[in-house]
Amino acid sequence: MQEYNNQDYKQPLRIGVGGPVGSGKTALLEILCKTIRDKYQIAVVTNDIYTQEDAKILTRAQALDADRIIGVETGGCPHTAIREDASMNLAAVEELAKRHKNLDLVFVESGGDNLSATFSPELADLTIYVIDVAEGEKIPRKGGPGITRSDLLVINKIDLAPYVGASLDVMEADTARMRPEKPYVFTNLKEGIGLQKIIDFIVDKGMLPKVD
């Protein structure tokens, strides 16, 4: 891992997690943290416009110790805080790195956003974008940077497909067409379906040491 300039703490891998409101971003972070926290040193930065609600949710769920979670109140458009002016998020990541000098990984969860949201490369080394089946099978073919450019696309809540009339086969075909050669995974996070594929992606693409 790289070091911060003249500092005694390393720079952790930073993974941006984006997606529309209700798609399952916070639920994904909760289950990821609980699953790999004994193997890696983890922290989380959450973004909300006027509150720190997502940070509180993760703390109440005991996903991580409270001092490993920072909630950023963006006070405006959540896109700006992860793209045009990521200074608040960058400061939060650095604060966590100072608190925990051997930090391996920081997740940066965006505020609820739309398909056009992207993370500044200064803020995120890798990006995961979460959509959910309940939004309808048309979502993958709508495109947008979240669909086409994210390093990993997570299509969540596959258990709801029969209830909303969505075809997972159609969604998979559209996803493969919209992001050729880029990975995607279908998940039901409540049952842990697809979780290991996400973890494998993080470890492999993030070049984290493999820990049994």
Curated annotation (Swiss-Prot):
Coiled coil: none annotated. One of its GO terms (cellular component) is cytoplasm. It is found in: Cytoplasm. This is Urease accessory protein UreG. SUPFAM superfamilies: P-loop containing nucleoside triphosphate hydrolases. Belongs to the SIMIBI class G3E GTPase family. UreG subfamily. PANTHER family: UREASE ACCESSORY PROTEIN G. GTP binds at residues 19-26. Facilitates the functional incorporation of the urease nickel metallocenter. This process requires GTP hydrolysis, probably effectuated by UreG. Pfam families: cobW. Keywords: Chaperone, Cytoplasm, GTP-binding, Nickel insertion, Nucleotide-binding. GO terms for biological process: urea catabolic process. GO terms for molecular function: GTP binding; GTPase activity; nickel cation binding. Homodimer. UreD, UreF and UreG form a complex that acts as a GTP-hydrolysis-dependent molecular chaperone, activating the urease apoprotein by helping to assemble the nickel containing metallocenter of UreC. The UreE protein probably delivers the nickel.
